[in-house]
Regions:
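Phosphate- and other anionic-substrate recognition elements at nucleic-acid/protein interfaces
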Residues: 2-8, 15-139
Length: 139
């Protein structure tokens, strides 16, 4: 029996990682949670466990580009982290240009949530779902 695999979306940051998942059909991205970063080893372990639990075979990660199109300052750290996650979880890694994903996430949240504190708690995972949905819409 062929079990459908999900895709995971990540919005990588220095302090937090936003997490989203696709439905099993691969059409719709949904925010899941925000990982408050501790250290890289624990972060990789947590995400690997989540990947196995949710039956994920592809991880879509936002790669920070500057508006000029050049890789942003944090891009190298994102790529290093992605390589370690790929080794640990044995998944395919896909990078998506994440320019303006946080701005779009903030705009979406402003429409429904007035409290900045509540929006801040959800921002990274909503941004991860936008990154993942961008990929799903192009495949």
């Amino acid at each position: 029996m062929n079990v459908s695999k999900r895709l995971m979306g990540l919005d990588f940051g220095k302090a937090r990682i936003g997490i989203a998942f696709s439905d099993i059909m691969g059409f719709l991205a949904t925010p899941h949670s925000t990982l408050k970063r501790t250290n890289e080893e624990d972060d990789i372990k947590y995400l690997t466990n989540l990947i196995n639990e949710k039956n994920v075979d592809t991880v879509v990660i936002g790669l920070p580009f500057e508006m000029s199109g050049n890789k942003g300052e944090i891009a190298n750290a994102v790529e290093e982290f992605a390589n370690k996650l790929k080794e640990s979880a044995n998944v395919k890694i896909v990078f998506v240009d994440e320019r303006l994903s946080s701005v779009e996430a903030e705009e979406q949240l402003k429409q429904t949530i007035k409290s900045w504190e509540k929006r801040k708690q959800l921002l990274d995972q909503v941004s991860a779902s936008i990154i993942l949905q961008t990929y799903l819409d192009t495949k």
